[in-house]
């Protein structure tokens, strides 16, 4: 498929974005992109992966790269094509021939070939980064580094000595649940992928003494 990309977005060391990912850290290493409305898809596109090939400019390497969607490009030029990508500086440089990164970054809007691909984070398992406002009555976290589809259909949380409870997806990669009584850990998290409907269980992944802003890594990922 043919789309367009440009470079007004992130530097290699940037963090955050609408999806809330730590984009400069492994395994992303800054190889990220903001997506136009059809790609970001109201947050459903957070964490999805795309292969991009640039061959319409002399500075293009004509070698594909893979990027993860971590932010939104909401309107204006971003909505002018069926698909639009705003690449990070590092990702834009990776599309270029050796020594031609700055030339490609200054080229403006480029026509590219793209396709959705499965995410593959080697030697990395799913992680849960607790939201700054999370508390025992309001559990919320960002889910990071899912292999495969990269997007999730369902997440369920199981408190200590309790049943699995469905969580609600916010307009990003954040999932939340509110409770009238405090929820106590350790917590099991069950995740269902959106496309393949595969299920993985992260057992006791969030400890009883969890804290906001902390990241808890599981020992599982989609295959």
Swiss-Prot record:
Provide the protein's localization.
Secreted, Cell wall; Membrane
* Alphabetized SMART domains for the sequence: DPBB_1 (SM00837)
One cellular-component annotation, GO:
extracellular region
Provide the disulphide bond pattern. 19-46, 49-119, 54-60
Q: Which domain of life is it from?
A: Eukaryota
Which InterPro entries does its entry note?
Answer: Expan_Lol_pI, Expansin/allergen_DPBB_dom, Expansin_CBD, Expansin_CBD_sf, LolPI, RlpA-like_DPBB, RlpA-like_sf
Expansin-like EG45 domain residues are: 16-124
UniProt keyword terms in alphabetical order: Cell wall, Disulfide bond, Glycoprotein, Membrane, Secreted, Signal
Q: Which residues form the Expansin-like CBD domain?
A: 137-218
Q: Which GO terms describe its biological process?
A: anatomical structure morphogenesis; plant-type cell wall loosening; sexual reproduction
Q: What does this protein do?
A: May cause loosening and extension of plant cell walls by disrupting non-covalent bonding between cellulose microfibrils and matrix glucans.
Record protein name field: Expansin-B6
What organism is recorded for this protein? Arabidopsis thaliana
């Amino acid at each position: 498929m043919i789309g367009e990309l440009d470079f007004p977005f992130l530097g290699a060391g940037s963090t955050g974005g609408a999806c809330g990912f730590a984009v400069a850290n492994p395994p992303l290493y800054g190889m990220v992109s903001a997506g136009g409305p059809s790609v970001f898809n109201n947050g459903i596109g957070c964490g999805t992966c795309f292969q991009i090939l640039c061959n319409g400019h002399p500075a293009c390497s004509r070698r594909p790269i893979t990027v993860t969607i971590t932010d939104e490009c909401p309107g204006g030029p971003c909505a002018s094509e069926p698909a639009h990508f705003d690449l990070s500086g590092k990702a834009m440089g990776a599309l270029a021939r050796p020594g031609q990164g700055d030339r490609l970054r200054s080229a403006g809007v480029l026509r590219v070939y793209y396709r959705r691909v499965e995410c593959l984070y080697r030697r990395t398992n799913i992680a849960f980064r607790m939201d700054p406002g999370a508390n025992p009555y309001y559990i919320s976290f960002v889910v990071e580094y899912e292999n495969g589809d990269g997007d999730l259909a369902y997440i369920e949380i199981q408190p200590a000595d309790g049943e699995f409870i469905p969580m609600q997806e916010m307009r990003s990669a954040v999932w939340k649940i509110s409770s009238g009584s405090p929820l106590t850990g350790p917590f099991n998290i069950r995740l269902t992928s959106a496309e393949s409907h595969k299920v993985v269980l992260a057992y006791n992944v969030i400890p009883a003494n969890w804290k906001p802003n902390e990241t808890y890594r599981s020992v599982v990922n989609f295959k």
